[in-house]
Amino acid sequence: MREILEDICCSEVRVVVGEGSLSKLSKIKDNNAAVIYSRKISIADKINKYLPNAYFIPINDGESTKELSSVISLVEKLFEKNFDRGDYIIGVGGGTVTDVAGFLASIYLRGLNLINVPTTFLGMVDAAIGGKNGVNFNNIKNLIGTFYQPSMIISDLEFLETLPIEELKKGLAEVIKYGLTLDKELYDYLSLNKEKILNKDKQALEDIIFRSTLDKLSIVKEDERETKGIRIVLNFGHTIGHAIEAGSSFNVPHGYAISVGMVCEAKMAEELGYAEEGVVEDVLWLLQIYGLPYDISQIDAPVDLKLALNAINMDKKHRKDVILIPFPTRIGSWKKVEVPLDTVKGFAEQCLKK
Protein backbone atom coordinates (compact mmCIF):
# COMPACT_ATOMS: atom_id res chain seq x y z
CA MET A 1 0.00 0.00 0.00
CA ARG A 2 1.38 3.40 -1.03
CA GLU A 3 0.20 6.92 -0.24
CA ILE A 4 0.47 10.28 -1.96
CA LEU A 5 -0.27 13.55 -0.17
CA GLU A 6 -0.61 16.61 -2.38
CA ASP A 7 -1.70 20.19 -1.77
CA ILE A 8 -3.84 21.40 -4.66
CA CYS A 9 -4.89 25.02 -4.47
CA CYS A 10 -6.67 25.22 -1.11
CA SER A 11 -7.20 21.47 -0.66
CA GLU A 12 -5.14 18.60 0.71
CA VAL A 13 -5.63 15.47 -1.38
CA ARG A 14 -4.58 12.07 -0.03
CA VAL A 15 -4.39 9.12 -2.42
CA VAL A 16 -4.04 5.57 -1.13
CA VAL A 17 -3.13 2.88 -3.67
CA GLY A 18 -2.94 -0.82 -2.91
CA GLU A 19 -4.68 -3.90 -1.64
CA GLY A 20 -6.71 -3.30 1.51
CA SER A 21 -6.70 0.48 1.20
CA LEU A 22 -10.48 0.61 1.67
CA SER A 23 -9.74 0.29 5.39
CA LYS A 24 -8.79 4.00 5.35
CA LEU A 25 -12.53 4.76 5.45
CA SER A 26 -12.41 3.97 9.16
CA LYS A 27 -10.85 7.43 9.63
CA ILE A 28 -14.33 8.95 9.22
CA LYS A 29 -16.37 6.29 11.03
CA ASP A 30 -17.79 8.88 13.44
CA ASN A 31 -19.04 11.13 10.62
CA ASN A 32 -22.29 11.07 8.68
CA ALA A 33 -21.63 9.67 5.19
CA ALA A 34 -23.71 9.09 2.06
CA VAL A 35 -22.32 6.39 -0.21
CA ILE A 36 -23.24 7.01 -3.85
CA TYR A 37 -22.51 3.70 -5.56
CA SER A 38 -23.09 1.78 -8.76
CA ARG A 39 -25.98 -0.67 -8.80
CA LYS A 40 -23.67 -3.06 -10.66
CA ILE A 41 -21.54 -3.76 -7.60
CA SER A 42 -22.21 -5.27 -4.18
CA ILE A 43 -20.51 -2.86 -1.86
CA ALA A 44 -22.58 -2.53 1.33
CA ASP A 45 -20.83 -5.25 3.33
CA LYS A 46 -17.36 -3.94 2.45
CA ILE A 47 -18.26 -0.36 3.37
CA ASN A 48 -20.22 -1.25 6.52
CA LYS A 49 -17.13 -2.97 7.85
CA TYR A 50 -15.55 0.47 8.23
CA LEU A 51 -18.61 2.76 8.22
CA PRO A 52 -21.41 0.96 10.08
CA ASN A 53 -23.81 3.93 9.87
CA ALA A 54 -23.35 4.81 6.21
CA TYR A 55 -26.37 5.86 4.13
CA PHE A 56 -26.35 4.00 0.79
CA ILE A 57 -27.75 5.52 -2.41
CA PRO A 58 -27.52 3.30 -5.53
CA ILE A 59 -27.37 4.87 -9.00
CA ASN A 60 -26.95 3.54 -12.51
CA ASP A 61 -23.38 3.49 -13.81
CA GLY A 62 -23.54 4.99 -17.31
CA GLU A 63 -23.70 8.25 -19.22
CA SER A 64 -27.51 8.34 -18.87
CA THR A 65 -27.01 8.98 -15.14
CA LYS A 66 -24.91 12.09 -15.80
CA GLU A 67 -27.95 14.34 -16.09
CA LEU A 68 -29.12 17.25 -13.94
CA SER A 69 -32.33 15.40 -13.12
CA SER A 70 -30.31 12.58 -11.54
CA VAL A 71 -28.34 15.04 -9.42
CA ILE A 72 -31.50 16.82 -8.26
CA SER A 73 -32.95 13.52 -7.04
CA LEU A 74 -29.76 12.96 -5.03
CA VAL A 75 -30.00 16.47 -3.57
CA GLU A 76 -33.51 15.61 -2.40
CA LYS A 77 -32.23 12.50 -0.63
CA LEU A 78 -29.51 14.45 1.19
CA PHE A 79 -32.03 17.10 2.18
CA GLU A 80 -34.36 14.45 3.61
CA LYS A 81 -31.48 13.14 5.74
CA ASN A 82 -30.49 16.62 6.97
CA PHE A 83 -26.92 16.49 5.66
CA ASP A 84 -24.72 19.39 6.75
CA ARG A 85 -21.32 20.74 5.71
CA GLY A 86 -19.43 18.48 8.08
CA ASP A 87 -20.77 15.35 6.38
CA TYR A 88 -19.24 13.20 3.65
CA ILE A 89 -20.16 12.11 0.16
CA ILE A 90 -18.38 8.91 -0.91
CA GLY A 91 -18.48 7.99 -4.59
CA VAL A 92 -17.96 4.26 -5.14
CA GLY A 93 -17.88 2.99 -8.72
CA GLY A 94 -16.65 3.95 -12.16
CA GLY A 95 -16.04 7.37 -13.64
CA THR A 96 -19.74 8.13 -14.01
CA VAL A 97 -20.36 7.57 -10.31
CA THR A 98 -17.40 9.62 -9.12
CA ASP A 99 -18.34 12.41 -11.56
CA VAL A 100 -21.88 12.57 -10.19
CA ALA A 101 -20.80 12.19 -6.55
CA GLY A 102 -18.20 14.93 -6.95
CA PHE A 103 -20.66 17.29 -8.62
CA LEU A 104 -23.20 16.62 -5.88
CA ALA A 105 -20.63 17.22 -3.13
CA SER A 106 -19.54 20.49 -4.74
CA ILE A 107 -23.02 22.04 -5.00
CA TYR A 108 -24.82 20.83 -1.88
CA LEU A 109 -24.49 23.59 0.76
CA ARG A 110 -21.62 24.89 -1.43
CA GLY A 111 -19.49 21.91 -0.55
CA LEU A 112 -19.48 18.69 1.47
CA ASN A 113 -16.44 16.53 2.16
CA LEU A 114 -15.74 14.16 -0.74
CA ILE A 115 -14.04 10.77 -0.94
CA ASN A 116 -13.64 8.92 -4.23
CA VAL A 117 -13.43 5.13 -4.24
CA PRO A 118 -12.95 4.12 -7.89
CA THR A 119 -13.76 0.47 -8.57
CA THR A 120 -12.63 0.42 -12.21
CA PHE A 121 -9.13 0.66 -13.57
CA LEU A 122 -10.09 3.73 -15.63
CA GLY A 123 -11.36 5.41 -12.48
CA MET A 124 -8.17 4.63 -10.58
CA VAL A 125 -5.82 6.04 -13.21
CA ASP A 126 -7.89 8.98 -14.40
CA ALA A 127 -11.55 9.70 -13.71
CA ALA A 128 -11.40 9.85 -9.90
CA ILE A 129 -8.29 12.06 -9.88
CA GLY A 130 -8.06 15.79 -10.47
CA GLY A 131 -11.25 17.32 -9.11
CA LYS A 132 -13.24 17.63 -12.33
CA ASN A 133 -16.92 16.81 -11.90
CA GLY A 134 -19.84 17.27 -14.23
CA VAL A 135 -22.94 16.17 -16.06
CA ASN A 136 -23.83 16.05 -19.74
CA PHE A 137 -26.23 18.41 -21.49
CA ASN A 138 -27.63 18.38 -25.05
CA ASN A 139 -25.35 15.49 -26.04
CA ILE A 140 -22.27 17.47 -24.92
CA LYS A 141 -20.16 15.63 -22.38
CA ASN A 142 -19.55 17.41 -19.05
CA LEU A 143 -21.00 20.71 -20.27
CA ILE A 144 -22.13 21.55 -16.73
CA GLY A 145 -19.56 20.95 -14.02
CA THR A 146 -17.24 22.11 -11.27
CA PHE A 147 -13.68 21.80 -10.02
CA TYR A 148 -13.83 20.23 -6.56
CA GLN A 149 -11.06 18.18 -5.01
CA PRO A 150 -11.72 15.03 -2.98
CA SER A 151 -10.06 14.91 0.41
CA MET A 152 -9.17 11.29 -0.25
CA ILE A 153 -8.99 8.87 -3.17
CA ILE A 154 -8.89 5.17 -2.33
CA SER A 155 -7.68 2.84 -5.10
CA ASP A 156 -8.08 -0.64 -3.63
CA LEU A 157 -6.75 -3.36 -5.93
CA GLU A 158 -9.25 -5.87 -4.56
CA PHE A 159 -11.87 -4.25 -6.80
CA LEU A 160 -9.84 -5.26 -9.85
CA GLU A 161 -9.73 -8.99 -9.04
CA THR A 162 -12.97 -9.69 -10.94
CA LEU A 163 -12.59 -6.87 -13.47
CA PRO A 164 -12.92 -8.22 -17.05
CA ILE A 165 -9.84 -7.77 -19.21
CA GLU A 166 -11.80 -5.51 -21.58
CA GLU A 167 -12.47 -3.10 -18.71
CA LEU A 168 -8.77 -3.09 -17.88
CA LYS A 169 -7.95 -2.22 -21.50
CA LYS A 170 -10.33 0.74 -21.45
CA GLY A 171 -8.32 2.25 -18.63
CA LEU A 172 -4.98 1.47 -20.23
CA ALA A 173 -5.66 4.03 -22.95
CA GLU A 174 -5.35 6.80 -20.35
CA VAL A 175 -2.20 5.26 -18.87
CA ILE A 176 -0.66 5.13 -22.34
CA LYS A 177 -1.61 8.80 -22.75
CA TYR A 178 0.52 9.70 -19.71
CA GLY A 179 3.43 7.73 -21.09
CA LEU A 180 3.21 9.33 -24.53
CA THR A 181 3.03 12.93 -23.34
CA LEU A 182 4.54 13.12 -19.85
CA ASP A 183 6.44 10.06 -18.72
CA LYS A 184 8.85 8.11 -20.92
CA GLU A 185 9.69 5.81 -18.00
CA LEU A 186 6.02 4.84 -17.81
CA TYR A 187 5.96 4.26 -21.58
CA ASP A 188 8.99 1.97 -21.21
CA TYR A 189 7.41 0.16 -18.25
CA LEU A 190 4.28 -0.50 -20.31
CA SER A 191 6.42 -1.72 -23.19
CA LEU A 192 8.28 -4.23 -21.01
CA ASN A 193 5.46 -5.51 -18.78
CA LYS A 194 2.57 -6.32 -21.10
CA GLU A 195 2.10 -9.90 -19.88
CA LYS A 196 2.10 -8.94 -16.20
CA ILE A 197 -0.32 -6.08 -16.74
CA LEU A 198 -2.79 -8.03 -18.89
CA ASN A 199 -2.63 -10.91 -16.40
CA LYS A 200 -3.51 -8.39 -13.66
CA ASP A 201 -0.36 -8.95 -11.65
CA LYS A 202 -1.04 -6.94 -8.50
CA GLN A 203 2.38 -5.37 -8.23
CA ALA A 204 2.36 -4.32 -11.88
CA LEU A 205 -1.12 -2.80 -11.54
CA GLU A 206 -0.15 -0.98 -8.36
CA ASP A 207 2.94 0.36 -10.10
CA ILE A 208 1.07 1.85 -13.05
CA ILE A 209 -1.83 3.17 -10.95
CA PHE A 210 0.62 4.86 -8.59
CA ARG A 211 2.71 6.27 -11.44
CA SER A 212 -0.36 7.48 -13.36
CA THR A 213 -1.69 9.16 -10.22
CA LEU A 214 1.62 10.96 -9.68
CA ASP A 215 1.68 12.09 -13.31
CA LYS A 216 -1.85 13.45 -13.26
CA LEU A 217 -1.54 15.14 -9.86
CA SER A 218 1.71 16.82 -10.91
CA ILE A 219 -0.21 18.53 -13.71
CA VAL A 220 -3.35 19.29 -11.69
CA LYS A 221 -1.25 20.87 -8.94
CA GLU A 222 0.22 23.34 -11.43
CA ASP A 223 -3.02 24.16 -13.23
CA GLU A 224 -6.09 22.97 -11.34
CA ARG A 225 -8.61 25.08 -13.25
CA GLU A 226 -7.03 24.97 -16.71
CA THR A 227 -6.08 28.65 -16.69
CA LYS A 228 -2.34 28.27 -17.39
CA GLY A 229 -2.40 26.01 -20.42
CA ILE A 230 -0.69 23.15 -18.56
CA ARG A 231 -3.58 20.85 -17.67
CA ILE A 232 -4.52 20.72 -21.33
CA VAL A 233 -1.91 17.96 -21.77
CA LEU A 234 -4.35 15.60 -20.06
CA ASN A 235 -6.63 16.08 -23.06
CA PHE A 236 -4.34 14.47 -25.63
CA GLY A 237 -6.60 12.27 -27.77
CA HIS A 238 -9.71 13.79 -26.26
CA THR A 239 -10.72 16.29 -28.97
CA ILE A 240 -11.26 13.49 -31.48
CA GLY A 241 -12.07 11.00 -28.72
CA HIS A 242 -14.95 13.05 -27.36
CA ALA A 243 -16.17 13.56 -30.93
CA ILE A 244 -16.29 9.78 -31.38
CA GLU A 245 -18.22 9.41 -28.13
CA ALA A 246 -20.73 12.10 -29.10
CA GLY A 247 -21.07 10.73 -32.63
CA SER A 248 -21.98 7.33 -31.23
CA SER A 249 -24.43 8.85 -28.72
CA PHE A 250 -21.96 7.71 -26.05
CA ASN A 251 -22.17 4.04 -27.06
CA VAL A 252 -18.39 3.84 -27.61
CA PRO A 253 -16.50 3.31 -24.33
CA HIS A 254 -14.40 6.31 -23.32
CA GLY A 255 -11.11 4.41 -23.34
CA TYR A 256 -11.65 3.06 -26.85
CA ALA A 257 -12.65 6.49 -28.17
CA ILE A 258 -9.53 8.06 -26.64
CA SER A 259 -7.38 5.27 -28.08
CA VAL A 260 -8.50 6.06 -31.64
CA GLY A 261 -8.39 9.78 -30.84
CA MET A 262 -4.72 9.58 -29.82
CA VAL A 263 -3.77 8.00 -33.14
CA CYS A 264 -5.64 10.65 -35.11
CA GLU A 265 -4.13 13.51 -33.10
CA ALA A 266 -0.63 12.01 -33.31
CA LYS A 267 -1.03 11.86 -37.10
CA MET A 268 -2.13 15.49 -37.04
CA ALA A 269 0.93 16.42 -34.96
CA GLU A 270 3.31 14.60 -37.28
CA GLU A 271 1.78 15.86 -40.52
CA LEU A 272 1.70 19.45 -39.27
CA GLY A 273 5.35 19.22 -38.28
CA TYR A 274 5.05 19.37 -34.49
CA ALA A 275 6.03 15.77 -33.74
CA GLU A 276 9.22 13.92 -34.54
CA GLU A 277 8.95 11.37 -37.30
CA GLY A 278 8.03 8.02 -35.78
CA VAL A 279 5.71 9.28 -33.04
CA VAL A 280 2.66 7.83 -34.80
CA GLU A 281 4.41 4.45 -35.01
CA ASP A 282 5.22 4.62 -31.29
CA VAL A 283 1.57 5.35 -30.49
CA LEU A 284 0.28 2.61 -32.77
CA TRP A 285 2.73 0.01 -31.49
CA LEU A 286 1.82 0.40 -27.82
CA LEU A 287 -1.92 0.45 -28.51
CA GLN A 288 -1.62 -2.65 -30.68
CA ILE A 289 0.30 -4.76 -28.17
CA TYR A 290 -2.43 -4.09 -25.60
CA GLY A 291 -5.20 -4.90 -28.06
CA LEU A 292 -6.69 -1.41 -28.10
CA PRO A 293 -8.46 0.02 -31.16
CA TYR A 294 -6.38 2.38 -33.27
CA ASP A 295 -8.73 2.87 -36.23
CA ILE A 296 -12.42 3.78 -36.42
CA SER A 297 -13.09 0.54 -38.34
CA GLN A 298 -12.33 -1.32 -35.10
CA ILE A 299 -15.16 0.49 -33.28
CA ASP A 300 -18.36 -1.57 -33.32
CA ALA A 301 -20.88 1.23 -32.73
CA PRO A 302 -21.86 3.51 -35.63
CA VAL A 303 -20.45 7.04 -35.39
CA ASP A 304 -22.54 9.85 -36.89
CA LEU A 305 -20.12 12.28 -38.55
CA LYS A 306 -22.42 15.28 -38.15
CA LEU A 307 -22.78 14.73 -34.39
CA ALA A 308 -19.04 14.15 -34.08
CA LEU A 309 -18.13 17.37 -35.90
CA ASN A 310 -20.65 19.31 -33.82
CA ALA A 311 -18.91 18.04 -30.68
CA ILE A 312 -15.64 19.46 -32.03
CA ASN A 313 -17.37 22.83 -32.50
CA MET A 314 -18.41 22.65 -28.84
CA ASP A 315 -15.02 21.46 -27.57
CA LYS A 316 -13.97 23.33 -24.42
CA LYS A 317 -10.56 24.00 -26.02
CA HIS A 318 -12.22 25.85 -28.93
CA ARG A 319 -11.18 29.52 -29.08
CA LYS A 320 -12.78 31.52 -31.92
CA ASP A 321 -11.47 29.82 -35.09
CA VAL A 322 -8.83 27.57 -33.47
CA ILE A 323 -8.68 24.62 -31.10
CA LEU A 324 -5.90 24.24 -28.56
CA ILE A 325 -4.50 20.72 -28.83
CA PRO A 326 -1.68 19.11 -26.84
CA PHE A 327 0.54 17.32 -29.34
CA PRO A 328 3.17 14.73 -28.40
CA THR A 329 6.47 15.94 -29.85
CA ARG A 330 8.34 12.77 -28.89
CA ILE A 331 7.73 10.11 -26.26
CA GLY A 332 7.36 11.83 -22.88
CA SER A 333 7.21 15.39 -24.26
CA TRP A 334 4.41 17.59 -25.56
CA LYS A 335 3.54 21.02 -26.94
CA LYS A 336 0.33 23.06 -26.88
CA VAL A 337 -0.63 24.14 -30.40
CA GLU A 338 -3.37 26.36 -31.81
CA VAL A 339 -4.81 24.41 -34.73
CA PRO A 340 -7.36 26.00 -37.08
CA LEU A 341 -10.82 24.58 -36.46
CA ASP A 342 -11.25 23.60 -40.11
CA THR A 343 -7.95 21.69 -40.01
CA VAL A 344 -9.04 19.72 -36.95
CA LYS A 345 -12.40 18.91 -38.52
CA GLY A 346 -10.66 17.87 -41.73
CA PHE A 347 -8.46 15.39 -39.87
CA ALA A 348 -11.49 14.21 -37.91
CA GLU A 349 -13.40 13.48 -41.11
CA GLN A 350 -10.48 11.41 -42.41
CA CYS A 351 -10.20 9.49 -39.16
CA LEU A 352 -13.92 8.82 -38.77
CA LYS A 353 -14.56 7.41 -42.23
CA LYS A 354 -14.93 3.63 -42.01
From Swiss-Prot:
GO CC terms: cytoplasm
EC number: 4.2.3.4
Gene Ontology molecular function, alphabetical: 3-dehydroquinate synthase activity; metal ion binding; nucleotide binding
Biological processes per GO annotation: amino acid biosynthetic process; aromatic amino acid family biosynthetic process; chorismate biosynthetic process
Binding site for Zn(2+): 174, 238, 254
Co-factor binding details: Binds 1 divalent metal cation per subunit. Can use either Co(2+) or Zn(2+).
Ranges in coiled-coil conformation: none
Enzyme class: lyase
Residues bound to NAD(+): 61-66, 119-120, 132, 141, 159-162
Signal peptide: none
Record bears the keyword Hydrolase: no
Family that this chain belongs to: Belongs to the sugar phosphate cyclases superfamily. Dehydroquinate synthase family.
Protein name, per record: 3-dehydroquinate synthase
Source organism (scientific name): Saccharolobus solfataricus (strain ATCC 35092 / DSM 1617 / JCM 11322 / P2) (Sulfolobus solfataricus)
UniProt gene name: aroB
